[in-house]
Swiss-Prot record:
Highest taxon of the lineage: Bacteria
InterPro entries: ACT-like_dom_sf, ACT_dom, UPF0735_ACT_dom-cont
Record's protein name: UPF0735 ACT domain-containing protein Amet_0565
The ACT domain, residue ranges: 73-148
Length: 149
């Protein structure tokens, strides 16, 4: 939970959101990508009213839009195998995120806990894509976003 801009912000999985909020994001994406020119076209394509779009458009953003130029702190659970942390760091480097801090606990029971703080200003992909790529590395058990500034 974060407090900014006169309100409290939450990170919520899209599965928990009402359809009207998801349609708002979809309409905004259509406009952003230039697939439609007007808001009227966008809301018609996604099947929502213009009044609902205007009501929510300033209050919902994909996580990657909120995180551009921010500091993200992640917690990773990795199997204690040679080279896994290196692969994770290589993936971060490929995304052009900047590692600000990294902390690793002593591995116990074959598991290593890692905390990584990233500066996202120069990232060439969004944070969700980076997490998906890191999750595909053999030995990465779990990744959570702990904080964002």
């Amino acid at each position: 939970m974060m407090e900014r801009d006169g309100g409290t912000h939450y990170i919520v999985n899209e599965k928990a959101l009402p359809i009207v909020l998801l349609k708002t994001v979809e309409a905004k994406e259509l406009l952003k990508k230039g697939e439609v020119v007007t808001i009227h076209e966008a809301v018609d394509r996604v099947g929502m009213s213009r009044s609902a779009y205007y009501k929510y458009k300033d209050y919902i953003f994909p996580l990657y839009e909120m995180n551009k130029g921010k500091i993200i702190t992640m917690h990773l659970i990795l199997k204690h195998l040679p080279g896994i942390l290196s692969e994770v760091l290589n993936q971060i480097a490929e995304s052009e995120a900047s590692v600000l801090t990294i902390n690793q606990s002593i591995p116990a029971h074959g598991i290593a806990n890692i905390s990584v703080a990233l500066e996202t200003r120069q990232m060439t992909i969004n944070i969700e894509e980076l997490i998906l790529k890191m999750e595909q590395i053999k030995g990465v058990q779990k990744i959570n976003i702990l904080a964002q500034e």
